[in-house]
Amino acid sequence: MHCPFCGANDTKVIDSRLVAEGEQVRRRRECVACGERFTTFETAELVLPRLIKQDGTRQPFDEEKLRAGMQRALEKRPVSVERLEAALAHIKSRLRATGEREVKSLVVGELVMAELRKLDEVAYIRFASVYRRFQDLDEFREEIDRLAREPAKE
């Protein structure tokens, strides 16, 4: 690593510690050339796969768009921000676990539906009605009946 003081290429690590609940490594470094010490922090860069939209276009995963969609479905529902954030983290974890560089947006939609179903059934129906483009009351009834018949998967 380059020394931020003199620009030399040769630095040595004199101390390493886990910080941020094990999510980061803090390193104390010393420049071999000038002797100055400095601190660096390392975190794993966890890249989420790109999304393949239904029309075939590709776009980067957008966590804010995902959060906004889930918040819209959960509007005025008794679900804490902590539970929403945990659901978002679970969705991102499942996407990373695929090991794929690209996933179809349908995969994300199904993961969102599964998480919303565990959080709040009304929010699940709200999201499903938009996501699956319900056209009439019969489609709502069918989904509600299916919800009543099939237990949510944990």
UniProtKB/Swiss-Prot annotation:
Binds 1 zinc ion. Its cofactor is Zn(2+). It comes from Pseudomonas putida (strain W619). One of its GO terms (molecular function) is DNA binding. A zinc finger (unnamed) spans 3-34. The gene is nrdR. InterPro entries: ATP-cone_dom, NrdR-like_N, RNR_NrdR-like. This is Transcriptional repressor NrdR. Negatively regulates transcription of bacterial ribonucleotide reductase nrd genes and operons by binding to NrdR-boxes. Residues 49-139 form the ATP-cone domain. GO terms for biological process: negative regulation of DNA-templated transcription. Belongs to the NrdR family. Keywords: ATP-binding, DNA-binding, Metal-binding, Nucleotide-binding, Repressor, Transcription, Transcription regulation, Zinc, Zinc-finger.
